[in-house]
């Protein structure tokens, strides 16, 4: 089997297959984070059979591909938890067509809290020694895990030691490349990092009543 994957309206292959009635994407087109997986005979010249993964948007496409990854034995935690990946000589497909549902919760994710005590130190000392900080290489692994868990939302580390997320430009690019929506938590009202960006000696107390 070949695997053909792409997003409706963004992938030439997927749009061609739909225009030739090889696949019917009407059920998911325009939806939020949906995907379809279908076994297609003779999808394009030279390929007798293919598994086609079509997503309604970027995350839908990713979820479809990663659902196949999970089905063949790759745990979403393969990297973070050293979950072993069982090697298989052959993988079989049991269904001809599958269409996912729209997630019942629109935004699903995590907040990296109190990273000073663990994740920041590990990243600085082991994974991003050259940067000496919690940066894009670490965020790439976090974002990959989120996609593999079919999540889409991340409130980043924000302590003074690990810096505000946007202070390292590559962080934003990494999050966007994984189609992860970035949010903010208690230390970042209005996307301003009070833990590291508010300078009391120059800006005064963080107190609206007395320091407007």
Task: Specify the residue positions occupied by each region the protein language model found.
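Aromatic-lined carbohydrate-binding surfaces of glycoside hydrolases
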Residues: 7-16, 104-212
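Contiguous, structured surface segment used for ligand recognition
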Residues: 1-102
